[in-house]
Amino acid sequence: MNPDLIEGGRWPLDWRSLYPRERWLWWEQLWMDVCALRERYRLAIRSGWWEDSVQVEALAALAAWVDRYDTGEWDDPPGKLALLFELERIDALLREGAEPFHPSRDREAFLAHLLTVGCQRPLNHGDAGG
């Protein structure tokens, strides 16, 4: 998570209350987080995860949880172990869908979805890719 993107340093776990440009940034941050979580924890994320509200909420919560440990905000070894043990249950939530998630292939569909849900690309905002 990039705390420089918002005032206060933390995005909300849900995008719906944000303004259209903030929504774009929220989704872009989640995209980057999902790409990192997929690699780090070998999660079976499926193509189109952004269209499933349960998967979006699970991924946003997991990203926030991991971020708190990575930044040192939380220093709780039993809590970190709990996170690691929860990965199997979280992974089960992410198995819905036919095709595996491939960031380079799925990027255009993801960007189209952002427009569908009312996001507005900020001015001078590059493509985060994946």
Residue ranges of each PLM-predicted region?
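Short terminal alpha-helical segments
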Residues: 2-46
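Amphipathic alpha-helical binding modules
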Residues: 74-130
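Low-complexity, compositionally biased segments
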Residues: 17, 36, 55, 109, ...
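Charged, amphipathic alpha-helical oligomerization/scaffolding segments
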Residues: 29, 36, 57, 61, ...
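Conserved aromatic-histidine-acidic binding/catalytic patches
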Residues: 18, 22, 26, 47-54, ...
